[in-house]
Amino acid sequence: MRVIHILDHSIPLQSGYAFRTQAILKEQRALGWETFHLTGPKQGPTAATEEEVNGWHFYRTPPPGGILDGVPGLSELELMGEIAYRIEQAARRVRPHLLHAHSPVLSAIPVLRAGRRLGIPVVYEVRSLWEDAAAGNGTREGGLRYRLRRGIETWALRRADAISTICEGLRGDIVARGIPAEKVTVVPNAVDVEEFSMGGAPDPGLKKQLGLDGVLVLGFIGSFYAYEGLAVLLRALQQMLAQGERVRVLLVGGGQQDAELKRLASELGIENQVVFAGSIPHGEVQRYYDLIDVLVYPRLSMRLTELVTPAKPLEAMARGRLLVASDIGGHRELIRPGETGTLFKPGDPEALSAAVRALLREPARWPGLKAAARRYVETERSWQASVARYADVYARVTQPHRRA
C-alpha cells in the first residue's frame, strides 16, 4: 500500500497536529505500508522543495508569494493551486494507491482536484472543521464568513471517497450534514504508551529552579488559545490563595493568549504565584508533567470544544497524573468522571477551585484514579490500536470498480 499524506504542516514544526501525523506515519510504516509526505505552503520557507527531517522525507510546497498574497479569497485560491500542482508532481513520481488529505479543507480541495485528474481515490481526514477553527480565532459563529466556510467544508466532505476523523463529536456533525454514516470512520487521538510511561518523581533541581518547592502545583501544558479557558484557571487560583491554600500554577507552552494571561495574572495580584515556563522541546515534556500535582483543562464551552477532543489529557493520563477538566463534549469523550478524572462546570472559577479542593480531600482515591487513567489509554487509546482502523478505510477505497 502506497499512500501520499498531504499535510498543512509537519516536523520540524512542533504542534499537536505534527505530533499526531508522526504517530500515524510511524504506525503505518510498522504495518508495512509505504508512506510519502507532502506539506502545503503553511510549512513556511524551506531550504529545498524536498527535505529529510529525522529520517522522514517530505515534499514541500513553497509559499506562493505572488501579487495575490494576503488578498482574501484570492490568496487561498493561489495556495490551493500550488498544492494541487505539487501533488500531481509527487503522484506521478510515486504512483500511490491513494491520497490521504489531512485538514484543513484548504489542503483537501486540491487533493480532491488532483485525485480526480489522476484517477486516484481520496481519503479526507477531518481533525477540526474549518468554520469552527475560524470561530475559535475570532470569526463570528453563524456569520456570513462562517457559513461560507461551512459550505465549502461540506462540499469537500461530499466529494471524498472516504472520511476519517478524530472523535465521535466530529463524526456526528459530519453525518448530520447528509454524509452517509458508513463513509465516516473515527481514528481517535491516542498516545505513545511506551514513550509516556507511568509518572516518576519530580526533578528536584527543576522544581527548585521554577520556585515550586513546598506548594501544590496546578498545571497546564499546551497552546494558549482563548478557548482553552486559562483565564478561568487564574481566577480559580486567586480564590484558592485567598482561602489560604499553598498553591501555584505552572503554565507550559505559549500562543496568542500569552501576553493577555500575564496581564491578567498581574491584574489579579497573583503574578508571583503563576510560573510561565514558555515553550519546551517535546522530549522535555514528561519532566514537566512530573512537576504537576493536578493537570487542569478548563476549556470553554463552544461548538469547537463541544465537538473536538483534545490530545493533551491523554498524555497526562498515560503519565498517571490527576486531572480536572471542564464538563464539555470534547472532555466527556475522554474522561470518565470519578473513574479517570474530575469534571467541573465550564467557565466557572469557583467550580474549578471546588473540584480541586474536593480531589485534595480524598488522597485515598488518587492511586485508583491514576491507575484507571493509565489503563484507559493502554487499552483504548494507543496509537497501534487507533491507526489499525485505517486498514478497512484504505481497503474500501482502493478496491477496483469503486465508482459507478
Q: How should each PLM-predicted stretch be described?
A:
Residues Y297, E315-A318, L322-A325, I335:
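Short hydrophobic beta-strand element within catalytic cores of glycosyltransferases
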Residues I4-I6, L212-L237:
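Conserved donor-binding/catalytic core segment of Leloir-type glycosyltransferases
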Residues G169, A190:
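Carbohydrate-associated surface elements
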Residues M1-P62, R402:
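N-terminal subdomain of nucleotide-sugar transferases
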Residues P337-G338, T342-P349, A358-A364:
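Conserved acidic donor-binding segment of nucleotide-sugar-dependent glycosyltransferases
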Residues A351, A358, R365-E380, R389-D392:
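A short, well-ordered alpha-helix in the C-terminal region of glycosyltransferases
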Residues A259-E284:
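Nucleotide-activated donor-binding/catalytic signature segment of Leloir-type glycosyltransferases, i.e.
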Residues V94-L98, D161, Q273, Y289-E306, ...:
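Acidic donor-binding loop of glycosyltransferase active sites
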